[in-house]
Amino acid sequence: MVRLIGLFGAVAFCFSTSAVAQTSDQAVIDQYWARWNDGEGLKLLNHLAKCVAERHPAAADAFVTNTTDATALQKDQEHLVDTGCIKKYWFRTSSTTIDPEAYRPMLAEALLTTSYSSGSIPAVNAVTAELDRPRLPNVPIEKVHPYYRVMFLIDKHNAALAGYSECIVRQQQDAVLALAVTPLNSEEEATALAEIEKASPNCDPYRPDVSFPSYVRRGDLMLQLYSLTRLAGGQVPQSRS
């Protein structure tokens, strides 16, 4: 059985870190995202996302755009975790772990490259609707119960990254889409990300207070771009299988 990380994985992370006193925000973010910074896990997720986007685009679109259902991945494992796709890359499925938070951005990128490989992407800078993302209460961390502080910090900084990414996408959607052709975790990716961020000075007020791995920054840009293209009238790609 393919293992899925969801709410219980996040809770387990809280248990593992909540006892650490005075941990810096950066250390919390580093530890949280380090679980997917091994390269091979990302390659498998990337392969799975591309295969699923081609075989089951409607299911992939529903999962990417529905960020409120924490059990969405479990509900549609047949399509979203297609074992046939996994076996094309890895001969076993029992040891495969899928984290929705890492998988959703990769599916978004795969859907973008499937839908708009010709470059005919809808303009997103005129989309007035706000993207659906968590809105955290504006309270100081000292007011948060110690048990929830780690997840509060993670949600806070992830939300800041989402706002920063959305700002960049609204200004540089073509450059963000071009980022998809760079290999994952490569020098080309790092260079492209740096250039995109440098060319978006108007978004600096939204820049997170902590740094994120390149694959997280890339993924969040792709997630915001896909979400905005759907709001701009972009269509779900058709299955190629």
Label the model's feature ranges:
Residues A59-A62, R92-E101, A175-A178, D209-G219:
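Extracellular/mature segments of secreted proteins
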Residues M1-L7:
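Bacterial N-terminal signal peptides that target proteins for export
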Residues E188-S241:
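A cross-kingdom marker for long, charged
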Residues F8-G9, A19:
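Cleavable N-terminal signal peptides
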